[in-house]
Every structure is written in structure tokens, then in C-alpha cells.
Regions:
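Alpha/beta-hydrolase superfamily serine-hydrolase fold, recognizing
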Residues: 1-273
Length: 273
């Protein structure tokens, strides 16, 4: 049985303090730059320029619920990958309910396009946490958006999701019911915007790793299970990593400070492709 959301929120406080510490107090010597891709105040992205040109760029999309402060609220993750030599791009985007679907997806495509066109990029690993995984999946699988923005999928080497909202029909917690109600104009839109419904036989066959905590009471594990099942149904390259005992917020521990014992598995996946 999942533990109650109330208990999970109590446990979150300790991790949020750790995130704050690494965001603003630790590793202050690590520099970053911010670039604008549009006119809205949230239309910018933060870049940590790594030292190893052989490594891919990490394009990390945060979840709107957890990181309303945008890239400033997840600098710890940028610093983590930077210390391993990666370039890291963290795009900001306009949030619901002030801005509804498809504004967030269009923002991500605009940020990605702006970065790629202004830099010499060979490979990109797209990562998304929580609702950011929905946006990450769209960047890889939304064919109409790729055509609209003229995105070259060939530079994306892999997709990694963390506790991702990948099947809206399985987002049954109160938190995500509220999120979806704010994100969409009506529940009738769910089928058409559900990330899992983007996958078909013609979808790109890039490697995908879905990471999910076994005790995630915010986003059901079924999201990742069903997403990987559908990818592999069409002969894709999907892998599922279930982390025993992990709750939704615990996944961030993988990429803060020095990471933990499971971080190596994910870094190994990144380095394989």
C-alpha cells in the first residue's frame, strides 16, 4: 500500500532543504548563463557549460508543480551533471492555470529549437521529471509539433523520465487531478493530449528509460509501466527502472550532490548511447 500523501509531504521537507542548499548555497563557483527564446518572462533557459565535449547535452525539463520558480529552483540538478562534464540546458516555460495546453509544449519546442540553432550540438539526452516528462515525451513523439518547429529528432540520443505523467488515464491522485484540470480546458481533451497516445508504429526508435518509485503516491507507477509497454509493443527500445521504496520526490536525490547508489545505473544508460 502507498503511504498517505500527508506523510509523504512531511518527508519532502528534508529533501526540499537539501535541494535549496545545493541550489543556492553549495557549489557557488559553478557558473551558468541564461538566454531568452521569447517575450514572456518565463521564456528563457539556463545553460551550464560542461567541460567534456564528447558528452551529450542534457536537456532537463522540470515539473511545473514542484518547480514553480523555474530553472532557478533546480540549479542543483544542473550543477550535478555539470560536475560530470555535461552541458546542461534547463528550459523555463509558462505555467498553468494562467497558460493552458498547448502553451507549455510550444515553449519547450521553442527553447529546444533556439538552443540547437545557436550551438553546435551533436547529441541531446532529453529528461523530464513529473509533469516535465509529459513535455519531454512530446518533444520526442509529437509529430505535428516537430513539423511546426522543424525539429531534427536525429540529435536526440535518448529519453529519460522520472516519475513521469505519461498516461493521463493513470494520473489518479488528487494532486494530479488538480494539475490536469488546470492544464487542460476540459477533460474531453485528455485522450488527444495524453502522451502515451503519441506512440505508434512510426514513432522514433530511440532508447527510453522510465524511472519510477515503487511508493510514488503522486504519479502512479502504471504511468511508466504502460508507456514502456507501448514503446516495446511497436518494437521500440524501452526500459523500466523501478526503485524500491522511492516516493515521488525521492527521485530527485538521484541528481543532487553526489547522487546515490542508483545514480550509476542511470549514468550508465546515458553513456551507452
Amino acid at each position: 500500500m502507498y503511504e498517505s500523501n500527508k506523510e509523504e509531504k512531511k518527508l519532502n521537507r528534508k529533501l526540499f532543504f537539501k535541494i535549496f542548499n545545493y541550489n543556492f548555497l553549495r557549489d557557488r563557483n559553478i557558473e551558468y548563463e541564461e538566454f531568452r527564446y521569447g517575450d514572456n518572462k518565463r521564456n528563457y533557459y539556463r545553460v551550464y557549460k560542461g567541460y567534456d565535449k564528447r558528452k551529450p547535452t542534457i536537456f532537463f525539463i522540470y515539473g511545473g508543480g514542484a518547480f514553480r520558480r523555474g530553472p532557478r529552483g533546480c540549479g542543483a540538478i544542473g550543477k550535478f551533471f555539470y560536475k560530470y562534464g555535461f552541458n546542461v540546458v534547463i528550459p523555463s516555460y509558462e505555467l498553468a492555470p494562467e497558460h493552458k495546453y498547448p502553451v507549455q509544449i510550444e515553449n519547450i519546442f521553442s527553447a529546444f529549437k533556439h538552443y540547437v540553432e545557436n550551438n553546435k550540438i551533436k547529441k541531446v539526452v532529453v529528461m523530464g521529471y513529473s509533469s516535465g516528462a509529459d513535455l519531454a515525451a512530446n518533444l520526442v513523439y509529437n509529430e505535428s509539433m516537430k513539423k511546426k518547429f522543424n525539429i531534427d529528432i536525429n540529435i536526440i540520443s535518448s529519453l529519460i523520465t522520472l516519475g513521469g505523467t505519461l498516461d493521463f488515464s493513470k494520473c489518479n491522485s488528487k494532486e494530479y487531478e488538480k494539475y490536469i484540470n488546470k492544464y487542460l480546458y476540459s477533460k474531453e481533451q485528455i485522450f488527444y493530449v495524453n502522451p502515451i497516445n503519441l506512440i505508434d508504429k512510426d514513432s522514433p526508435k530511440i532508447p527510453v528509460l522510465c524511472i519510477h518509485g515503487s511508493k510514488d503516491s503522486i504519479v502512479s507507477l502504471e504511468n511508466s509501466k504502460r508507456f514502456i509497454e507501448k514503446i516495446n509493443k511497436f518494437k521500440g527500445k524501452g526500459e523500466l527502472l523501478i526503485l524500491e521504496g522511492y516516493k515521488h520526490i525521492d527521485l530527485l536525490n538521484l541528481f543532487i550532490g553526489l547522487g546515490n547508489q542508483k545514480t550509476g545505473e542511470i549514468m550508465g544508460f546515458i553513456n551507452r548511447f
